[in-house]
Amino acid sequence: MKTNFDKILLIIVFIFYNTNIFSQEKDEDDAGTANTEFIDKKERKPWSFKLAPYAWLAGTSTDVGSEKIRQSFNDLTSLTNFGFQMVAQARYKKWTLSSNLTYAKLGDQMKEGRMIIDFAIDQIILDTKFGYTIIDKFDFGDDIIRGWAMDATIGVIYWSNDIAVDADLDSPIEIPGFPVNISEKMDYVDLVVGTNIRIILSKSVLLGLSGNIGGFGIGNSSKLYWDFSFTNTFKVSKLLTVTAGYKSFNAKTESGEGEDLVKTHIKTFGPLLGVAFNL
């Protein structure tokens, strides 16, 4: 039978490996691009820009070796002291450059008997992609807009966790070996390729479908990473769009060798919400 202290250690291990705790990443190619599609190609400006704050209200399922950890969105946000997510995108004709930043400052204190554990994590996830529109078939009629477009993308996701763990005993006398202080930085880069499809549903509604795959075990990257999302983007005005949808991502990582090999499988999923300012 596992003690609460065992569960605490499992949660810390989960945080070490799950570099997408608070939300990792809403797909930047779908957030707020509607205004480009709602404009006739003949009338589009060569350059367009957008800034899109968003939130992924995700829960997580994590398998670390033979142990299984399940955490809801409320569980994850209870560990988050500060965080934000933002997409910035520049488009030139059929070319796009987008960067999706997630920053989170995580931390908590846990106590089991006389043992006190404090942990803090500064987390950065930076997803940068180049994209090219390979299909652009939108039909602009007098009263309707219909059609679809597809982009191919390639880029990298940079994952970084600065981790600090302090363990001490609540004791009136000094205990040899305590306090224990652990500080470590864990980071790696995943190469990713993908595509996103945008389908016009009406003059003010755009459906987006997106998928990416990467990692491939290159260097210390994920053995395999993939994600899928769908979004509905609503045109509010010429400068503002609102996006709502759902996303799921999976990541498989390995650490150690031989008997010390630890395999981790992370599944993160949930609804996402965002707004975009189109310039």
Task: List where the protein language model places each region.
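Predominantly the C-terminal beta-signal and adjacent terminal strand-loop region
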Residues: 27, 228-279
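Transmembrane beta-strands of outer-membrane beta-barrel pores
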Residues: 55-59, 92-96, 101-107, 134, ...
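Residues on the lipid-exposed face of transmembrane beta-strands in outer-membrane beta-barrel proteins
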Residues: 51-53, 86-92, 128-132, 154-156, ...
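Short loop/turn motifs that connect adjacent beta-strands in outer-membrane beta-barrel proteins
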Residues: 39-47, 135-149, 201-205, 236-239
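Outer-membrane beta-barrel translocator domains and adjoining extracellular loop/strand segments
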Residues: 62-68, 109-114, 143, 162-172, ...
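Glycine- and aromatic-enriched membrane insertion/assembly motifs of diderm outer-membrane
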Residues: 70-135, 156-159, 233-235, 241
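Short glycine/proline- and aromatic-enriched beta-strand/turn motifs that initiate or cap beta-hairpins
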Residues: 24-100, 270, 276-278
